[in-house]
Every structure is written in C-alpha cells, then in structure tokens.
Amino acid sequence: MQINKLQVEAIKSGSVIDHIPAHIGFKLLSLFRFTETEKRITIGLNLPSQKLDKKDIIKIENTFLSDDQINQLAIYAPCATVNYIEKYNLVGKIFPSLPKKIDRILICPNSNCASHNHFITSSFIFTKDINNEINLKCQYCEKEFAKNIVL
C-alpha cells in the first residue's frame, strides 16, 4: 500500500512553483525577491520527482506571479509549472515559456558594456545556436553569451 503525503504543506491561496530543478529554488527566491516580502513562503529542496529525479518547490501564500515573472522562470527552470491555488484547490496551471527579451535581471559579462553604467539597465534577447542551445545577446554591446555564462 502506497501512502501519498505532501512533503511541503498545502497553502490555502497563492502560487506554487513546482518542478524546479534541484538547487535552483534558492536562486529563484532571490531573483524574484520573495524573501523581501512578509508573505508566508514554504520551500522544499531536493524532493523526489518522477519528472526530474530531484526537484525544488516553492509555495507563496496570497501571491500570484505576474506574466513577466512566469516567463522569466523559464530561463532558470524550463520544466517548471506554476499552479494557482484558491481555497486549497488548484484553479490554474501555467507552463512558462521563454521570453523574447529580459531586462534588469541579468548582468552582462562584458566588463566594457555600457549596461554597467548606473543609468542604464541591462537588456538581453534570447537566441538559439545551431545546436538549439539558448544564448543571450546583450542589447548594448551586442555580444552573445551562452546561457550558463550569464546566469
């Protein structure tokens, strides 16, 4: 007999970010500044997953992610899902998609880039190379970088 038990406590209302690759959960907490809120946040790390082997999960009470946040999530956790919960019931499920452009979040690795000026915010567009790998191209210096270099 298999017993199904939640490994991270259920929330009454809010967002659940599920299927985050293991070790990425803390990065998302700081990226979206979830730790700067008074909202209750529950995080599970290195949980067993049929889909990923191991996963992280984040539950944020009384908070619903913006479309921009959901799409930025795809950069770090392309297989993630965002579940909206109301009265302990699932009312919506979203599968993030990679945005065309991302502003202010990332830092250009090129030390000579104009985006390092205090009056300019960084801006990247996403491209794919011949191997279908995701790259980021800085809008200011126009240099292209592998995803793992910028993230």
Swiss-Prot record:
Binds 1 zinc ion per subunit. Signal peptide: none annotated. One of its GO terms (cellular component) is aspartate carbamoyltransferase complex. GO terms for molecular function: metal ion binding. Its cofactor is Zn(2+). Keywords: Metal-binding, Pyrimidine biosynthesis, Zinc. Zn(2+) binds at C108, C113, C138, C141. InterPro entries: Asp_carbamoyltransf_reg_N, Asp_carbamoylTrfase_reg, Asp_carbamoyltrfase_reg_C, Asp_carbatrfase_reg_C_sf, Asp_carbatrfase_reg_N_sf. The keyword Transmembrane helix does not apply. The keyword Cell inner membrane does not apply. One of its GO terms (biological process) is 'de novo' pyrimidine nucleobase biosynthetic process. Pfam families: PyrI (PF01948), PyrI_C (PF02748). Contains catalytic and regulatory chains. Belongs to the PyrI family. Involved in allosteric regulation of aspartate carbamoyltransferase. This is Aspartate carbamoyltransferase regulatory chain. It comes from Buchnera aphidicola subsp. Schizaphis graminum (strain Sg).
